[in-house]
Each structure stands twice: as C-alpha cells, then as structure tokens.
C-alpha cells in the first residue's frame, strides 16, 4: 500500500528532480558486460545498447533517464573457472568487452580511473565508466595479475564471489581460512598500494573483520544491504557497519528484492547453496536452467518498493552514519527488483523518497555518489603515500 503523499507533492517532485540532476549519481555494480557475453556472444552488433533492450535492465536510453553520472561495470566470470584455470583469461575478455563498449559508445561513456576523472566526465555530460572485478578467483593467486587488472582500469575487486577461494572465505560457502589467509592479507595490502578499493560484498563476516583490520584505505561493499532489515548472509551486520564507519568505507545498497525485502531474504537465504545442489543434480545446463526456473516460479519473491530499499539506507545511516552509504543496484546481475526500480531508469525515485523522508540535499548527494567519490579519493591518497 502506497504511503500518503505530503502536501505540495508536485513541488517536492520538482525539488527532487533538481537535486537529482545536480548530483553525480554513481552506481557500484552493474553486470551488463556478462549479459552481453551470455546473450549476444560479446557483440554489441548483436545487442546494441543504444537502443531499448527488453531482455536487459540496462541500456543507454534508460541510463540517461536514470541520470547516471558514473557506473562501475563489472568484470564477472563464474567461480567455477577457478577450478579449470580459465578465470584470468575469461576476465581479460570481459575487460576487453568493457573497453570496446566505452569506445563504441564514446558519445555517452568515457573511462574513468580516478575520482577527478569522474567529476570531469560528468561535467562533460557523459557517464563515467569505471571497472570493478567480482571475485578474487579471477587473479588465480597472482599479485602480478592483480596489478595487471589495475592497469586495465579496475578500481575495486571483490575478494570472493559465491565460493570460498584459497585465501578468502565467502559468505555463501564453507570456510577454509577462517577469514583471510596470510596471502589474503597480502592481497588487501597490495590493493591498498595500487589504489584499488577492497570490495567485501560477497565475503564471510570473518573475512570482513580481517579485511577491515588489515586495510589502510576505505573498503566498500559494492552491492550489499543491511542484515538487520533483511536477514541474508549477503547483507552487512551492525557490528561490521560500525567498523566500516571507523574505516571510512561505504556500503552500497543492493536493490535485489531477494536481499532487501525481509520475506524475500528468507526465500533466498540459501540460494547459492541450492543452486550448487541443483547443478549437481542436473549436470546438463538446459536441465539445470529448467529446474532453476521451476523453483523460482514456485517461490516468487515479493518485490517491495522504493521505500523497502530506503529502509536499508536509513538503517545504515543510523548505525554507520551518513558518510558511509551509497548505491550498488546489481542491475543485470540479479532478478526481482522493487517496484519503480525495475531498471536503471528508476534512480530518481530514490532521490524523491529520500527527500520525502527528510534528508537534506547535501546528504542526498552523499548517498547518490559523493561518499563513493570520497572513498576513492582516500584510496588514491593511501596509494600515493605508499608509492603505488
């Protein structure tokens, strides 16, 4: 049920629109590159995102409607590639795809490697395109590969995805190191030296604690929300939120209804483990997809709405403070999204909801992108001091 709208709703809508246009709206996580690989053979001739794409949550017309000023495009490859020795090679293909996308649509996108790049590109009316890597399995235990990824534009890396790796435990798999191994700590320090943000979105609570203890620069959660609101292991507990505040980090809220709606979180709490079992029971890819789809149809996730999402922002602000929250939607990487946030055109609705809840223009700008820019600047400063 929609909550009652305040008096002067049209005036508030106009004010929200003005605030949104003035902000640098930065999203921490978009999986469009993997969708282009999966659905279009990595070809923008086959999937021209300058045109509306009904199979996607992301295309250029809707990015413009959403007022995006900066986007982290994600280098994702399945965790299983770590077992076949193909993770790094496939990740490099995804880097190439992102660079080809930015070059092809150069009137819209421009690569950004620093916080100042983001500000400049936004001022020029383009969407600053940054790169995040989803999962430390992609470096195949090589610090040289990590540095190579940085040189290719990566400005954050998630320490794990859904599976535990040799040096870091995942939130959704069995523990192996009890957090970070000694080499895992070396990875974090090397990321600090390079100026690459440490992303804790998929890691276990123990890994979070270890990384926050070791890191000399702010960490981020590129697409995670508040555990106190929706109890899912992909979300962040209050004790960690307090540590993030001390660290200067940013929790960028995920929009996926299965992570932010309390009932949705209960349904998806064991989603990664369940999918691994389904794959074991159905080794044929088509059979697996059929079984997966049947389960989803039998267990629909409640959508929630913009307010459901902003409840997470409210909680993170309450526990960690206004300087430690941002947006990391996970478009084209997740399923059910809240009403009015079905695709990348919906960001202005968040600004309106924040304004209606009493957030100031200054604080809204922090949430929409200012906090992430500040964390990136601090990571750059730490790198500069260490000779990175």
Protein language model regions, located:
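Alpha-helix-loop-beta-strand connector modules within alpha/beta enzyme cores
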Residues: 177-193, 211-221, 350
